[in-house]
């Protein structure tokens, strides 16, 4: 079995990773780590997340100052850490032949200036930006198999790209009219740290990051076309529902659209394309699926995509990428 560790295990995504990895038949979860300053250091993860009692009763160990020994003892590491932290940790693990699955945005776009503009830090490892493979599992499996650094796609970018890529690949969209993505995420997408915006009495349905959210350039870069993206915070715990509007090329039929989706996802079990009806968050929460449905009228298409932001949008896709990297069935440990 491959020895796996999680750094940043006390957050929502880290806890989901722990739950998935503890029962994985090919990965042995050997350690959970948090920063030395974390208020959760030395606590048992199941004391923080009671749903993990008798499933994952492991301590949240403070990350040691010297990481070489830890990196040498692990075969793969999942970084559920802040972008700047992943930026600093990934090179150490890679230098010690440990495969890195990074759930932050630190290596998703091969452009150092992007990080200065959208993440607020200077990227010091341009060589790793070139080496990193973007972890959109259904579309980049071949490249994922050949890399030791996977930059797992973001939550909004995952559902947005899975919904749009087949139509762009089959040249069905008139991109003179930019696709418009309006997506609503549950409060868990804001992380576990307490803020006024995400507190119980303050949380509401509201747009944020209008025209300046860091996921917009991530989506545009990997789609190969600009988009208009507006994220929203919803007053529910988990899940993302994306409503995507685009213009079809003249004469494009529903059958051509179905064929495009079938061609893309017929052998991809974690994407479910609806024959009728439209996805909902209820259908995907607590699952590793992305569900897609569409309706067309008067030369336009409205696509509805839904996923669990903590699973297909984060932890489950990270494990899916690890499965692919090790030549395993990509759904192993997820279904």
Swiss-Prot record:
Which SUPFAM superfamilies would you find in this protein's record?
Answer: Glyceraldehyde-3-phosphate dehydrogenase-like, C-terminal domain (SSF55347), NAD(P)-binding Rossmann-fold domains (SSF51735)
Q: Name one GO molecular function term.
A: N-acetyl-gamma-glutamyl-phosphate reductase activity
Q: Indicate where this protein resides in the cell.
A: Cytoplasm
Q: Does the keyword Oxidoreductase apply?
A: yes
User: Which Pfam families does the entry link to?
Assistant: Semialdhyde_dh (PF01118), Semialdhyde_dhC_1 (PF22698)
Q: Name one GO biological process term.
A: L-arginine biosynthetic process
Q: Which UniProt keywords apply?
A: Amino-acid biosynthesis, Arginine biosynthesis, Cytoplasm, NADP, Oxidoreductase
* Protein known as: N-acetyl-gamma-glutamyl-phosphate reductase
For this protein, the record's PANTHER family field holds: N-ACETYL-GAMMA-GLUTAMYL-PHOSPHATE REDUCTASE, CHLOROPLASTIC-RELATED (PTHR32338:SF10), N-ACETYL-GAMMA-GLUTAMYL-PHOSPHATE REDUCTASE, CHLOROPLASTIC-RELATED-RELATED (PTHR32338)
Active site annotation, chain numbering: 155
> What organism, scientifically named, is this protein from?
Pasteurella multocida (strain Pm70)
**Which Gene3D superfamilies does its entry note?**
Dihydrodipicolinate Reductase, domain 2, NAD(P)-binding Rossmann-like Domain
Q: Which CDD domains match?
A: AGPR_1_C (cd23934), AGPR_1_N (cd17895)
As for what it does, the entry says: Catalyzes the NADPH-dependent reduction of N-acetyl-5-glutamyl phosphate to yield N-acetyl-L-glutamate 5-semialdehyde.
């Amino acid at each position: 079995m491959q020895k796996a560790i999680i750094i940043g295990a006390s957050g929502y995504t880290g806890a989901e990773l722990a739950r998935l990895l503890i029962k994985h038949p090919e990965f042995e979860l050997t350690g959970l780590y948090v920063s030395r300053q974390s208020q959760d250091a030395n606590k048992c993860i199941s004391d923080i997340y009671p749903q993990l009692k008798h499933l994952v009763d492991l301590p949240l160990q403070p990350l040691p100052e010297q990481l070489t020994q830890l990196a040498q003892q692990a075969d793969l590491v999942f970084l559920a850490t802040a972008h700047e932290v992943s930026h600093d940790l990934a090179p150490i693990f890679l230098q010690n032949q440990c495969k890195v699955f990074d759930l932050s945005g630190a290596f998703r776009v091969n452009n150092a200036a992007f990080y200065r503009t959208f993440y607020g830090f200077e990227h010091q490892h341009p060589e790793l930006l070139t080496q990193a493979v973007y972890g959109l599992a259904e579309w980049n499996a071949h490249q994922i198999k050949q890399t030791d650094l996977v930059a797992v796609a973001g939550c909004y970018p995952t559902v947005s790209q899975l919904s749009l890529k087949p139509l762009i690949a089959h040249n069905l969209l008139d991109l003179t009219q930019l696709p418009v993505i309006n997506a609503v995420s549950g409060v868990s997408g804001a992380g576990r740290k307490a803020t006024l915006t995400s507190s119980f009495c303050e949380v509401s349905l509201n747009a944020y990051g209008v025209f300046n959210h860091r996921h917009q350039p991530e989506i545009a870069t990997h789609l190969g076309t600009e988009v208009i993206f507006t994220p929203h915070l919803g007053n529910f715990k988990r899940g993302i529902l994306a409503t995507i509007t685009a213009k079809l090329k003249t004469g494009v039929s529903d059958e051509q659209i179905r064929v495009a989706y079938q061609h893309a996802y017929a052998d991809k079990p974690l994407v479910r394309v609806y024959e009728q009806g439209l996805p909902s968050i209820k259908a995907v929460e607590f699952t590793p699926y992305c569900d897609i449905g569409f309706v067309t009228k008067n030369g336009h298409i409205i696509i509805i995509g839904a996923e669990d932001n903590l699973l297909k949008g984060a932890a489950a896709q990270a494990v899916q990428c690890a499965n692919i990297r090790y030549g395993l069935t990509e759904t192993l440990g997820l279904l």
